[in-house]
């Protein structure tokens, strides 16, 4: 069985997080509950996970030399990517040198961009996906749109939180969607994926955890997106037995191909009993924030256990639950939050304020959580709590 040492001593079990956002913050808390020494790394100071870690470093994680220098200095037992935008070639090298990357360096590399994971799912594993084409130039992109027809979706192959993503309904959308995709990609201008639109009933995240004892699934998480960015999520999403079985089959295939240990967020489109693979994150998923109130072990606790090789004998879902994000728009380096008493006045509600050091434009700064007798009631309660929070910039 795994052994965990004493933090800040020669026996410490050191975990280094690449990325220090709100999801990483919860992972740090869970790792510290299990006695780990945690180092948080990100491109800006005072990031949420840094505020609860033992130490932190500020570097560009796309700079392979800087990333290697920090890892060689800290000598972590586990390297845990929390975001996609990392010098994954360096992670591959470090893994070959004996470091443990969660879940694997290959998983981080394949999921860093939409092309790697789409080709794995559709072409290697033969899983159902939307029809798709990749394009490097405007001419190729226009040809892809013409081939797939309207409506269709365009996304940069490297972006997160819906940045650069558009739904094209007709010819008038073609040029502006291309321009928006070129602005929204993490690596600047470049390659896009054009996908045929699936007329789905709903979309889910199937949180799938690969751990010492095998693979375990959480109850499906339903969610609502705006411009590709999560606004609210709920668990359990009602589904047919056939759709659940097919979702688990697809998630098992994808996570099995990526390998390693840890929690994965597998995104799927559902129509009746039919299921299509969309994307996968080899780490906790933003829509899974609902598990902070909906499960006895949150997605973050599950990730921590899986990383450390600890057993997950069961996951208990505690009833209809929902999350609603607290979005803030404007500019500030010292936002403050009030009316929290009203937000927490109803039973079975909770808040997480992420502690992000600044707002520039629109930013997710917290989440409201709620449980109730039905999904509809839980969603309404979470939205009331989120809307009650007042923000001063």
Curated annotation (Swiss-Prot):
Which GO BP annotation is one of this protein's?
'de novo' IMP biosynthetic process
The protein here is known as Formate-dependent phosphoribosylglycinamide formyltransferase
Q: Which organism is it from?
A: Azoarcus sp. (strain BH72)
Q: Write out the pathway annotation from the protein's UniProt entry.
A: Purine metabolism; IMP biosynthesis via de novo pathway; N(2)-formyl-N(1)-(5-phospho-D-ribosyl)glycinamide from N(1)-(5-phospho-D-ribosyl)glycinamide (formate route): step 1/1
- Which function does this protein serve? Involved in the de novo purine biosynthesis. Catalyzes the transfer of formate to 5-phospho-ribosyl-glycinamide (GAR), producing 5-phospho-ribosyl-N-formylglycinamide (FGAR). Formate is provided by PurU via hydrolysis of 10-formyl-tetrahydrofolate.
From the broadest rank down, the organism's phylogenetic lineage runs: Bacteria, Pseudomonadati, Pseudomonadota, Betaproteobacteria, Rhodocyclales
The UniProt entry, under Pfam families, shows: ATP-grasp, PurT_C, RS_preATP-grasp-like
Residues in domain ATP-grasp? 119-308
Q: Which gene encodes it?
A: purT
Give one GO term, molecular function aspect: ATP binding
